């Protein structure tokens, strides 16, 4: 089967996250950079203005920025390494514009200071309770196996109002070959199933998997679909991951990933966009 894969003109960008706002697509990626496009998903232009007011405690690792619109403001969920603790952690920044500047509203890392935490994402449940779902990175767990975690957020998104809970381990699925949890993204289906896209490594490389909550809640029991959403086994040539789903200006859903996960010859990690569809309570690529 020949799948449609849109290759962007961006030469190198990891963890691409796309939103559609006022007829314009915005793509954010590691390094705290932003690109935009209004007429094509292939051709993007770098936004040259300052995107983020860099927090004073930031010592690099400006990873996986996501931008979510909430209560009329734009919130960036992202990662950086702390000068004080030397650990990576998640933070939340706010702006009036999708082009920034985004200013930190949390008191530094919002995630536990004794953890390395990355890839925070945003979800609002059926009771309008905001959550951060994030990675408890394998480098700071007692057995070098990554976890997915979640905590409730305050209404203003400045702090946790619950202790983080563990959702699942990286080594739970039968296909998983590494202890990596990466790139969580929440998706609610039309029949109210709560899915999570996330990445680990199968026998062919970096991939995108689907987990689902058995009771439709963040703190429910999470089970793993056997069929991967994206794998080199299916698509050939390159692996890829850190997926998210967005809807374009015409209402078509797409999966955004970086592919490959590491350079292959002259091919760098670049944003790749693939049409996806919701069918029978899951996400599929045709």
What are the residue ranges of the model-derived segments?
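Carbohydrate-active catalytic/glycan-binding domains of CAZyme proteins
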Residues: 1-286
């Amino acid at each position: 089967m020949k799948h449609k894969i849109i290759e962007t003109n961006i030469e190198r960008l990891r963890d691409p996250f796309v939103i559609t706002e006022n007829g314009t697509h915005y793509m954010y990626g590691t390094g705290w950079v932003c690109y935009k496009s209004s007429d094509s998903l292939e051709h993007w232009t770098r936004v040259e203005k300052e995107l983020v007011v860099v927090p004073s405690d930031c010592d690099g690792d400006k990873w996986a920025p996501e931008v979510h619109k909430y209560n009329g403001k734009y919130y960036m969920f992202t990662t950086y390494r702390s000068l004080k603790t030397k650990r990576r952690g998640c933070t939340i920044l706010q702006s009036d514009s999708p082009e920034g500047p985004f200013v930190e509203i949390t008191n530094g890392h919002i995630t536990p200071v004794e953890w390395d935490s990355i890839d925070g994402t945003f979800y609002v449940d059926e009771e309008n309770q905001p959550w951060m779902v994030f990675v408890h990175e394998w480098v700071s767990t007692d057995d070098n196996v990554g976890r997915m975690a979640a905590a409730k957020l305050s209404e203003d998104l400045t702090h946790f109002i619950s202790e983080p809970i563990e959702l699942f381990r990286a080594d739970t699925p039968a296909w998983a070959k590494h202890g990596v949890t990466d790139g969580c993204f929440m998706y609610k289906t039309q029949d109210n199933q709560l899915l999570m896209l996330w990445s680990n490594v199968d026998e062919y490389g970096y991939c995108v998997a689907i987990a689902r909550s058995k009771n439709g809640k963040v703190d429910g029991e999470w089970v793993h679909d056997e069929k991967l959403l994206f794998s080199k086994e299916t698509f050939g040539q390159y692996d890829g991951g850190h997926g998210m789903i967005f809807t374009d200006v015409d209402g078509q859903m797409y999966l955004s990933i970086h592919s490959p996960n590491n350079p292959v010859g002259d091919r760098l990690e670049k944003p790749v966009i693939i049409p996806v569809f919701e069918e029978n309570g899951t996400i599929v690529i045709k």
